Amino acid sequence: MLSSTLRVAVVCVSNVNRSMEAHSILRRKGLSVRSFGTESHVRLPGPRPNRPVVYDFATTYKEMYNDLLRKDRERYTRNGILHILGRNERIKPGPERFQECTDSFDVIFTCEESVYDTVVEDLCSREQQTFQPVHVINMEIQDTLEDATLGAFLICEICQCLQQSDDMEDNLEELLLQMEEKAGKSFLHTVCFY
């Protein structure tokens, strides 16, 4: 068993759907979790596919919710965005950017390869101070409500296995191989240092 609670981060593009669904499920299971996005702005589906609604990361989930409610209650209820923002508001005030976080984690899950690349690049650009390892694991999760939920449960299962592991460093590769076979997904994995 790990001597302390596993510290987990989940990162997607905007810190709205995939990372927050995982945040919600991991938190309910009692895990120490934070969630983040990596882009410069939060982008939500707009009136047309090529016209997203764009917010600054300083905008709270409640402000986004109220803005979309005013713009088109029916559209944003139907596509699930109001439900997502309501859930998010119950977890934390607003989205956070990974690049602005100075906390350390044991494991960071990313939800798409471009986010994985950004997280690894950011960690490698920081000055190493403690040399504490952090495992960065990418799992491709489509940005849909259903896929976010399925991905969150898989992340939760991996975290619970790691939490029960006698030696995370030795067991992680084998665990990821088992999960790849079980889920039919392949994972990217690397180790960075704080």
Curated annotation (Swiss-Prot):
GO terms, molecular function: RNA polymerase II CTD heptapeptide repeat phosphatase activity
Catalysed reaction, written as an equation: O-phospho-L-seryl-[protein] + H2O = L-seryl-[protein] + phosphate; O-phospho-L-threonyl-[protein] + H2O = L-threonyl-[protein] + phosphate
Entry's Gene Ontology BP terms: mRNA processing; termination of RNA polymerase II transcription
GO cellular component, one term: mRNA cleavage and polyadenylation specificity factor complex
Top EC category: hydrolase
Cystine crosslinks: none
Stored InterPro entries: Ptyr_pPase_sf (IPR036196), RNA_pol_II_suA (IPR006811)
Keywords noted in UniProt: Hydrolase, mRNA processing, Nucleus, Protein phosphatase
Pfam entry (one): Ssu72
Gene3D superfamilies given in the database record: 3.40.50.2300
Transmembrane segments: none
EC number(s) recorded for this UniProt protein: 3.1.3.16
Localization per record: Nucleus
Keyword Hydrolase annotated: yes
Function recorded in the entry: Protein phosphatase that catalyzes the dephosphorylation of the C-terminal domain of RNA polymerase II. Plays a role in RNA processing and termination.
Family stated for the protein in its record: Belongs to the SSU72 phosphatase family.
UniProt name for this protein: RNA polymerase II subunit A C-terminal domain phosphatase SSU72 like protein 5
